[in-house]
Every structure is written in C-alpha cells, then in structure tokens.
Amino acid sequence: MFESIIVDRAKTTFLGELKSYNFSIYAQWLGILSIFLCIILGIVNLFHVTLVVLFSALTIIEGVLLIFIELPFLSRICPVSDKFQAFTNAFASNYYRGLVYFIFSVVTFLSCIFMATSLIATGIVLALTGLCYTFAGIKGQAFTSSSTLGGTGITTETPPSTMV
C-alpha cells in the first residue's frame, strides 16, 4: 500500500515537473543523464590506444564534478574542503551552469580529433544540458532543483481567495 503511494507521488511529481516548461528542471534531469554518460562512457573509452584515453579520463573527471554541481546535498554527506564547496556553489545560476556544460561539451567533442567514439553521445547530452540552462536563464527562470532529487521542486502559487 505504502509502495504504491510513494510510486504514485513520484510519478505525479516527476510528470508535473516535466509539464512545467521550466528549462532549469529539464536541464537538471539532462545533467543527471550527463553524469551517467560521462562516467560510463569515460570508463568504456579508457581502453583505446590513441589519445582518446586522455579525453576519457577528462570525461570521468567531468562526471565527478557534475555530481557535486547537480546534487549539492552530496557535498554535505561527503567530506569536501571549503574551497571545493565554494567552487561548486559558484554554479548556482543558470548561466554559469550552462557555461560549464558548454565547456565540458567542447572538451568532450575535441576527442573526435583523434577518433570518433561513443564520447560523442556524451558531448551531445552535455550541449543539450547547457542549452536548457541557457534557455532558463534567458527566460528569467530561477534555478530550481527537482523535488524528485531532493530539491524544492516547482512551486505552484494559489491565487489568494477574494472575499465578497
């Protein structure tokens, strides 16, 4: 019984966030996908004999950095230095997050100079995430973390009732 309530709440929360047209939420979910792709495809591409190995290692490092940028509660759980905490907190605005994702995307795409690998998929998702954060900044949407991931989520304001 409780499982179905939890699953139903997660579905409605997740679907509600997707229907919100908030690009910051879209970007956060694409950011989570980027983390998985960076780490998994970075490890997979470590076994090349070209300089793609260097870009694979950089992609893994990008994935680890993105974990702390996208999931800030982990910096409270994991012991990190105050400087690293301040570094990850610097990316609180949509524009800075978009810039970071675009830089990571360019670095990942540079691996194509040596060999076309599956890191292209990582670069595409990183670029899409950067676009979503940039669109959120252009539209004036404040950074909003998904309630499914432990954030505040989308707040829907109810209009004040009018008295007759």
Swiss-Prot record:
GO biological process, one term: vesicle-mediated transport
Location of the protein in the cell: Golgi apparatus membrane
InterPro entries named in the record: TVP18/Ca-channel_flower (IPR019365)
Record flagged with keyword Membrane: yes
Keyword Glycoprotein appears in the UniProt entry: yes
Glycosylation sites noted in the Swiss-Prot or TrEMBL record: 22
Keyword tags: Glycoprotein, Golgi apparatus, Membrane, Transmembrane, Transmembrane helix
Transmembrane segments: 35-55, 57-77, 100-120, 123-143
Membrane topology type: Multi-pass membrane protein
Top-level taxon in the UniProt lineage: Eukaryota
PANTHER family, per database record: CALCIUM CHANNEL FLOWER HOMOLOG (PTHR13314:SF2)
Function (record text): Golgi membrane protein involved in vesicular trafficking.
Record-stated family: Belongs to the TVP18 family.
Name of this chain's protein: Golgi apparatus membrane protein tvp18
